[in-house]
Amino acid sequence: MRILGIETSCDETGVAIYDEDKGLIANQLYTQIALHADYGGVVPELASRDHIRKTAPLIEAALQEANLTAKDIDGIAYTCGPGLVGALLVGSTIARSLAYAWNVPAVGVHHMEGHLLAPMLEDADNRPQFPFIALLVSGGHTQLVKVEGVGKYEVMGESIDDAAGEAFDKTAKLLGLDYPGGAALSRLAEKGSAGRFVFPKPMTDRPGLDFSFSGLKTFAANTINQAIKNEGELSEQTKADIAHAFQTAVVETLAIKCKRALKETGYKRLVIAGGVSANKQLRQGLANLMDDLKGRVFYPAPQFCTDNGAMISYVGYLRLKHGERTDLAIEVKPRWPMIELEAI
């Protein structure tokens, strides 16, 4: 079985092909970073229009990469949600149309389930076994999920306001960093010194597994404003020190909540996925945590941390093999709780 996967939930156009016997055999990705850079964030209408231009050429490129034709494809998977409604509609329309034209089944995939299962694309030694705790951390989501199998998910905690990735991006903007801000802030934080600034670790002084990062963003804004009053214009070192303090607070907050979830369940495996999972300090912090707990942390390869078609083709393969099908109606779900997914 070979499944073509299409990802268009936000500002990356991803197309990939997953083969039941060979694994991932094609992976094409186009990012819209340059398109949105002047605006300092994703402009939904521009994102949708760019997906229209790029999806078909990427499908052709993926088929060429795998040395296949349309006749070799057994099914199509596409991101059905959550995400930007216009962007989702582009991918779903193309996917449904191709499925009809090629006379193959199609299935709509949950974007965050794609991220959650992205580590399964790794080789057997680096692939987590069920059950595990998953930390899904991106620009739009911060969730702790108890995972007992494919589709067997329990959201144990999530952000009640800003996602961690969103807080990274907004703090980067306050520091005057280039878009995409989260990655720029992480690079700058590596040059910062510990101890000059100390940020709070929100909601760690109370029980529970929910997150809140809006207050941390406000604390960053106040810290930056005070530093400007003291220095006039912020030096690069001051910016780096603030970035380091902010990132440390986020990483330690995430680690504390992960530790609570692991202790509550007794699990020894932790998966970290989503765009922020590429953050070096976060990876190291969670690796240290799992060493202390005598467990293991798993994460996707760097190219599968951000949005991509590979994770969609893989999850689509699992669900199509199970017999799931999406009818011809072109329907997307900008908001889609994971608990609504069918267990397989």
UniProtKB/Swiss-Prot annotation:
EC number: 2.3.1.234
Cofactor binding, note field: Binds 1 Fe(2+) ion per subunit.
An example Gene Ontology CC term for this record: cytoplasm
Protein residues bound to substrate: 136-140, 169, 182, 279
Chief place of localization: cytoplasm
Pfam families: TsaD
Catalytic activity: L-threonylcarbamoyladenylate + adenosine(37) in tRNA = N(6)-L-threonylcarbamoyladenosine(37) in tRNA + AMP + H(+)
Binding site for Fe cation: 111, 115, 307
InterPro entries: ATPase_NBD, Gcp-like_dom, KAE1/TsaD, Peptidase_M22_CS, TsaD
Sections of the chain in a coiled coil: none
Superkingdom to which the source organism belongs: Bacteria
GO molecular function: iron ion binding; N(6)-L-threonylcarbamoyladenine synthase activity
Any GO BP: tRNA threonylcarbamoyladenosine modification
Subcellular location: Cytoplasm
Protein's UniProt keywords contain Zinc-finger: no
Keyword tRNA processing: yes
Family: Belongs to the KAE1 / TsaD family.
Function field: Required for the formation of a threonylcarbamoyl group on adenosine at position 37 (t(6)A37) in tRNAs that read codons beginning with adenine. Is involved in the transfer of the threonylcarbamoyl moiety of threonylcarbamoyl-AMP (TC-AMP) to the N6 group of A37, together with TsaE and TsaB. TsaD likely plays a direct catalytic role in this reaction.
The protein, known as: tRNA N6-adenosine threonylcarbamoyltransferase
